[in-house]
């Protein structure tokens, strides 16, 4: 979605290749609220690099100065010319041009990025519970939360992160226990028959909202989506 937005193409035109070290030589995995913050940032930077390189190639095709080439909504144009090129037109055209060394490889770029500054999402939550005074059984009756995750790229996914992490947090607080036999040292909870996970019928409908305050630590203003509720 990030690449499609910046390159001005449909999401269907973007193919993500993962787990191939011939293409991506280093990666740290998807954890610790880093996917959109780290990958989104390098996709943004790579998109800008690709657009600038593409402008140079388009200038050769149009036979104009690089400064005269403009890019908007996935289309390249030049001042005073009616002809336009989209990404696919330009890719085909680039195979017919005698490209200088700085444009070798055509419409390909490699981009790395190191992020050393931490970001801190934040939020506020309120939970209403009903407690059976005789048994001590706790039922979660209502849960509401407002989270600041920085810029929200995809609200549906962020809501899903919030719901999933709330369920995870409630499960850890109320049901999940890794019990060890004191004599043998063996775990008693060897299966999901003994290790209690939260289920949908034990949880209320979550009331969630987002408060966007952009992070100054990266160009997209990203923080993270799943840390607060957990």
Whereabouts are the PLM-identified features?
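C-terminal catalytic domains of large/alpha subunits in multi-subunit enzymes
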Residues: 2-230
């Amino acid at each position: 979605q990030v690449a499609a937005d910046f390159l001005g193409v449909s999401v269907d035109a973007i193919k993500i290749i993962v787990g191939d070290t011939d293409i991506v030589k280093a990666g740290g995995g998807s954890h610790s609220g880093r996917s959109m913050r780290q990958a989104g940032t390098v996709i943004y930077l790579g998109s800008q690099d690709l657009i600038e390189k593409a402008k140079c190639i388009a200038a050769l095709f149009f036979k104009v100065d690089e400064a005269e080439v403009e890019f908007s909504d996935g289309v390249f144009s030049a001042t005073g010319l009616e002809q336009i090129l989209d990404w696919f037109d330009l890719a085909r055209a680039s195979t017919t041009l005698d490209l200088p060394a700085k444009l070798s490889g055509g419409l390909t770029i490699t981009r790395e990025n190191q992020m050393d500054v931490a970001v801190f999402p934040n939020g506020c939550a309120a939970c209403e519970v009903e407690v059976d005074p005789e048994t001590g059984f706790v039922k979660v009756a209502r849960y509401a939360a407002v989270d600041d995750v920085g810029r929200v790229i995809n609200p549906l996914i962020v809501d899903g992160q919030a719901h999933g992490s709330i369920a995870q947090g409630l499960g850890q607080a109320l049901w999940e226990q890794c019990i060890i036999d004191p004599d043998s040292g063996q775990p008693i909870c060897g299966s999901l028959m003994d290790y209690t996970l939260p289920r949908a019928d034990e949880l209320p409908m979550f009331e969630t909202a987002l408060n966007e305050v952009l992070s100054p630590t990266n160009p997209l203003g990203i923080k993270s989506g799943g840390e607060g509720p957990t």
